[in-house]
C-alpha cells in the first residue's frame, strides 16, 4: 500500500501522523553538526517502506535534493528512527508493507526555533 502526505483515510492518517512526529523528533535530536555548521538547506523526497511489525524494509530517494549530504542525512535519520510502530491491524490485514512517500525539508530557522530543523511534510 502506498500513502503520501495527502492521505486522509483515518487509519492511515493516524499512523502517518505518529510516524511523521517520531521521525521529525528523532531527526531534530540527531541533526548532523556538519549540516548545521554549513547552514545547508534543501528538500529531498524519500519513500520509506515499513513492514507489518514496524521494521524498516527499504528507503528510496524519489527526488534528490541536489546535495548528496542532505540526501544521505535523510536516509540516516530514517534509519535512526526505526523500528517504527507496528502497523495497526486494520492496515496489516490489507498489506504486508506500507510505502510512505514524504518530503524531508532541511531548514535553517535559527531565529525562530533556536536551531536548524528537519520538517517532514
Task: Indicate residue ranges for each PLM-predicted region.
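Acidic, low-complexity proline/glycine/alanine-rich linker and hinge segments
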Residues: 1-33
Amino acid at each position: 500500500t502506498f500513502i503520501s502526505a495527502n492521505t486522509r483515510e483515518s487509519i492511515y492518517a493516524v499512523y502517518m501522523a505518529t510516524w511523521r512526529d517520531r521521525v521529525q523528533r528523532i531527526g531534530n535530536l540527531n541533526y548532523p553538526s556538519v549540516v548545521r555548521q554549513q547552514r545547508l538547506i534543501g528538500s529531498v523526497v524519500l519513500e520509506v517502506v515499513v513492514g507489518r511489525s514496524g521494521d524498516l524494509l527499504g528507503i528510496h530517494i524519489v527526488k534528490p535534493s541536489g546535495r548528496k549530504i542532505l540526501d544521505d542525512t535523510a536516509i540516516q535519520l530514517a534509519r535512526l528512527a526505526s523500528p517504527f510502530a507496528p502497523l495497526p491491524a486494520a492496515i496489516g490485514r490489507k498489506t504486508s508493507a506500507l510505502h510512505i512517500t514524504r518530503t524531508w525539508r532541511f531548514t535553517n530557522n535559527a531565529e525562530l526555533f533556536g536551531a536548524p530543523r528537519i520538517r517532514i511534510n
